Amino acid sequence: MHIAWLGKKSPFCGNVTYGREVTNSLLDRGYEVSFLHFAQEEADSDTWFGCQEVSLPFLYKSQIYTIPTLTASKVLTRSLKQLRPDIVHASLTLSPLDFLLPEICEELNLPLVATFHPPFDGKRRNLKSGTQLFTYQLYAPFLAHYDRVIVFSQLQRNFLVKLGVPLEKLAVIPNGVDVQKYSPGASNLKSQWNARHLFVYQGRISTEKNVEALLKAWKQSNLGDSCKLVIVGNGPLSASLMPFYGEEYGIIWLGFVADEQRRIEILRAADVFILPSLLEGLSLSLLEAMACGVACVATDAGADGEVLEDGAGVILNTHRVASQLHTLLPVFRDHLEWRTLLGQKARARVLERYTLSRNITQLEKLYAEVLRLQRVHLSTRA
């Protein structure tokens, strides 16, 4: 089977990781994959091996959205005609091209699958979640024209059904982690940072990630010199937060860490992983930390609460996150046995529900079903 994958290679975000892990796994299972992405010609050519690549022209791209050039749809159509894939899988990049894809693929008689990533909070508890609701409302009528739309949780599926996307169009296939790579193991980073207790945040430094609530709680808790908070990632709020939350409070800013093995070492050294988001989809960073056997704390935004339910971690309400963390941080510092138990439960939850291997097997079944329905559809038109 030949899969034309439309996704992202830069700038780094969860969508980039998702595309890399899934396409590499499909290649490992013997599929042919062509990778179409927004890039300048010859750019980013060293990240994916074994894929034929097609660069689509763009005016602007960020971690959140992409603005293609006016010729991008023509380049995409021409490329799909030349590649002649069996199926197109779009890991949606929040681009105007997303709305044209169903029409393009219908014209070429190509079945079309999408993965819909945008974070959400189905309870609409804050301004950010109201803004994100608009994205879902905007996309829902167009998602109905895709052959299948992959979402990461039952909660997200139910949310889209309420917005009018037919239930039969939606498939729940959660994010998955390579549990051989992301696993408990030795790390000497604690000694390097002179930390007895290590707390970690990994993700974008942006409003929806609510990192300032964590920083405020950390500063107010005054946990002592033996505790360190490591912030992995960058984003629009980094420059405004770093001057007020620095090393004098035991906070270590690492910025974006490109080396995956280094990120794994950080997670293996961590005692607690904290994700204070106001909005989420299903956080890969959270799953990676859980797979490494780290005790995890996250809000119930998006599907993260579903991941940690029934004792696999500590779930926060998106209201008053700083206050909740102010109470929890000293408890985590003082109770090793609880941290250890939560870490074991987190790893077990990932092994049960969120392995990359399981994810790819579900995806294979979805592709087979979509292709079967496509053949039936074409035969009835003949």
Segments and roles (model prediction):
Residues 4, 192-219, 230:
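Conserved donor-binding/catalytic core segment of Leloir-type glycosyltransferases
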Residues 155, 176:
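Carbohydrate-associated surface elements
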